[in-house]
């Protein structure tokens, strides 16, 4: 079960019994249970306008933006949530995934901001690991993928020895996260395949 699903169960119970429940919030919960995240966003934006900086609303709004593929708004919403609750693991997780999705978007191929999105995603996953512990397989996997994608991005322009060395370092960081994950979840073929891929890329850079 992912971080949002773990936390949302408590919010569902709370919203159905606590004084926090409001019309827009209740409608958003019903929509999310049906997988209708567009309606959820509409209702949560109204709730956010009425009760600014409510952590429960922001958590659900950020997740709904993510599910709708609106990654820019997802990032800004989770940034607001982190300013209120700095140790909210799910906020770093989904903000990191949103940043990585933006960085990997073909539409961003000419954007000078791509590198910033890669490094920011890695920082988010690293912060989440600091909070949740270094045996968090979900975070290790996503940071490993972020290192890999960032290394691929940098390798396209790597001409000089120092640039190639920097790419190798990123691929090695990816391998380290994947190998740590394998000690916790052995025989993950997808992870074994990614390690093989990383090693092949390192060989091509030498």
Question: Could you say what each language-model-derived stretch is?
Answer:
Residues 69, 96, 101-111, 144, ...:
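Short coil/turn linking the two alpha-helices of tandem helical-hairpin repeats
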Residues 46-49, 79-83, 123-131, 176, ...:
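Conserved structural position within tetratricopeptide repeats
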Residues 52, 86, 133-134, 186:
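Short coil turns that delineate tetratricopeptide repeat
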Residues 24, 55-56, 89-90, 135-138, ...:
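Helix-start (N-cap) detector for alpha-helical repeat units in TPR-like alpha-solenoids
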């Amino acid at each position: 079960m992912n971080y949002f699903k773990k936390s949302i169960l408590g919010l569902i119970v709370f919203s159905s019994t606590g004084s926090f429940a409001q019309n827009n919030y209740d409608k958003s919960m019903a929509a999310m249970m049906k997988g209708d995240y567009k309606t959820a966003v509409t209702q949560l934006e109204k709730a956010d306008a009425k009760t600014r900086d409510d952590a429960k609303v922001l958590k659900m709004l950020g997740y709904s933006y993510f599910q709708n593929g609106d990654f820019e708004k997802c990032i800004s919403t989770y940034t607001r949530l982190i300013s209120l609750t700095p140790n909210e693991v799910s906020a770093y997780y989904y903000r990191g995934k949103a940043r990585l999705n933006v960085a990997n978007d073909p539409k961003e191929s000419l954007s000078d901001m791509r590198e910033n999105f890669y490094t920011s995603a890695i920082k988010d996953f690293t912060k989440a690991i600091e909070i949740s512990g270094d045996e968090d397989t979900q975070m290790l996997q996503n940071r490993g993928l972020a290192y890999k994608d960032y290394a691929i991005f940098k390798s396209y322009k790597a001409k000089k020895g120092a640039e190639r060395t920097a790419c190798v370092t990123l691929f090695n960081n990816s391998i380290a996260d994947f190998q740590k994950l394998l000690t916790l979840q052995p025989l993950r073929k997808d992870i074994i395949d990614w390690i093989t891929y990383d090693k092949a890329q390192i060989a091509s850079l030498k």
